[in-house]
Amino acid sequence: MRVLITGTSSGIGKAIAEKFLKEGFDVTGFDRKEASISQDSYTHFCLDIRDREQYPALAPFDIVINNAGVQNENDIDINLKGTIAITEAYGIHDAIRAVLMIGSASGHTGAEFPEYTASKGGVLAYTKNVALRIAPYGGTCNSLDFGGVLTELNLPVTEDQKLWDQIMDLTPLKRWMTVEETADWAYFMTVTNRFCTGQNILI
């Protein structure tokens, strides 16, 4: 099967791509940065998901995973509008198996910066919209809304001992997720799962 994943050059997106490659899938990655994966079954395109004119014409994908995201002045344009643009271009067709959004706990809790929270909240609503539209094709659409994940992006948090201790006091398992665990969830929701759809899963 063919999988499209955005934001594959680092962090969660890279881990998801590596998981699907390990399982024998053909993976296409979109990222503004150069490829950090070198495998025969991996194809990489350097592009900005905000610019639809950069989107390549590609054969239909079985699975589309929207992972690309930022936390800056481009929150709405990338996290929400970019996710919508990618999905509309590659995820809405009669052979689609699954569309997955990588959301955020902030979309549920309202924490973080206003624009970021709004962008992720929009993704939660759009997930339900897509689920209804691809259900007639047997496709599913869900979002995985992670809290703390051990990525380079979160180093300012994990390396601040006082802040980290405060977070761990509120965390029952006393740790954050690894990127490999996020990849396992992504694989389960798009490959193993064939019935759950339209759900925003807070982890």
Can you describe what each PLM-predicted range is?
Residues 175-203:
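C-terminal substrate-recognition "lid" of short-chain dehydrogenase/reductases
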Residues 18, 84, 121-128, 132, ...:
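Conserved active-site helix of classical SDR/Rossmann-fold NAD(P)-dependent CH-OH oxidoreductases
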Residues 9, 17:
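N-terminal Rossmann NAD(P)H-binding glycine-rich loop of SDR-like oxidoreductase domains
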Residues 145-156:
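Short, flexible catalytic-loop segment of classical short-chain dehydrogenase/reductase
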Residues 67-72:
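Conserved NAD(P)H cofactor-binding loop of Rossmann-fold oxidoreductase domains
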Residues 98-122, 127-136, 148-149:
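Catalytic loop of short-chain dehydrogenase/reductase
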Residues 135, 140, 196-199:
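Short, small/polar-rich loop/turn modules that mediate ligand/substrate recognition or access, typified
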